[in-house]
Amino acid sequence: MLPVIFFTVMAISVVIAFLARTGLKNMTVGEFLVGGRSFPAWLLYFLAVGEIYSIGTMIGFPSGIYAKGASYGIWFLGYILLAYPLGYFVAPLVWRAGVRYDAMTIPDVFGRHYRSRGLELVTAVGVLVALVPWGQYQFIGMQVVLGALGLSISPVQGVILAGVMAFLYLAVSGVRSPAFVAILKDSFMILGIVIAGIAAVVATGGIKETSGPQAVPHALVTMSGSPLVFAMTTIVVQSIAFYLGFSAMYLFTAKSERAVKSSTVWMPLYMLMYPFLVAVSYYALEAHPNVKNPNTIFMVATKGLLPDWLVGVVAAGAGLSGVLVLATTALAIGGVVSRNLVPNIRPESQRRWATVVIAVFLVAAAVLTLTGSTLMLTILNLVYYLLAQFVPGWLALMFFKRVQAWAVGTGLVVGIVASIVLYILNPSLGGVNLGLVTMLLNAVLTFGLSYLRPGPERLPMAQWTRGQKDVAERDVAQPVRD
């Protein structure tokens, strides 16, 4: 019964992906990548929360609490909560940049604002470096879900299934497919989390018995020293990077600034599901204390709490979460390669190129997952170390007039290289998040070099309105359109 429910829901999601194209006669690259900038607030909302509350919510969050204790749960919750008020003010500026430069990718914005093909290329490579481990993150989660189904399929077959579904989502409807599938995904994800959380509380005899000192070791729910410093600094860096990293692409799909703000207002409601996840995590600490792979703990606990058919519901929510974000990640990479990395591709050919790149990325990320799987929240940290490196460039184009393109590029390159080196070496630094260190280094280079040698004046996004051009912008060729 469990596999039947799981695969039925997956099949329904593919049908929804095909139906998402209804009414579209010509799938231009603009429709494919950013939905023609036509998404109303409600559709942007589902696309956005589909990205935010991914398989990391169901699989990675409990695994972090189970393996590392309270500090992982606190920073995971804290950075999302802080990101929303920041996003209410910052996200509309990202959308403005997309409209101003007819941008469909982050490199589009950086290259056109700073009038630098070199910076566009550097940004494109940086985005690719950041998004590949993010794709691996989704594949690892899918492996966990498929393994929990008890089917006689290998890890290779599992990642192939996830990759094929993600490709089908995108090949027919582009970004519209993930947007509409997100509605189905959210329904099953929330239902699965709530059911599992309630079952955990009932199984332990009540809330006090689930989270009280007799059930959860004191060391797992208290922080001091380095873990506390890590949690606080992680909240800061990841909340800042939240809307200035991979979230930019889905913001480009909105029809207006008002749609962006309206969708952001209601996103915190999804945080109500986290107490249920905490309940499952605490139940697992007592009921399953010796699980070797922490990534599996949510599904292990769920299988011990629920009948097979309800486990199928939970697994369907987790599976859709992984495939959905995997699809949007692949779409972002396809857009970057076809529009920014490979030169002189005609607009009418960019969609075909993007589709090919999507397929190549899915294969590459699957291979990386099979050969280098690790704890999910560890990979999440690496992703945010890398995404944080785009923050200085975004802040410069939003609020500053005379930042140099080469200074932004220098800061970006140094920040990315430093992030990878520090991730490999893993120095303690007193618990300070390594992404914060590298982001500050990046910012010092970006703004310090520009202070020493100011660039031409450019109107920042915070002061820009439609139809307005600054002096530097008048000399820029019009961006390529569909």
Model-found features: residue ranges?
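Membrane-embedded helix-loop-helix hairpins and adjacent transmembrane boundary segments
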Residues: 1-482
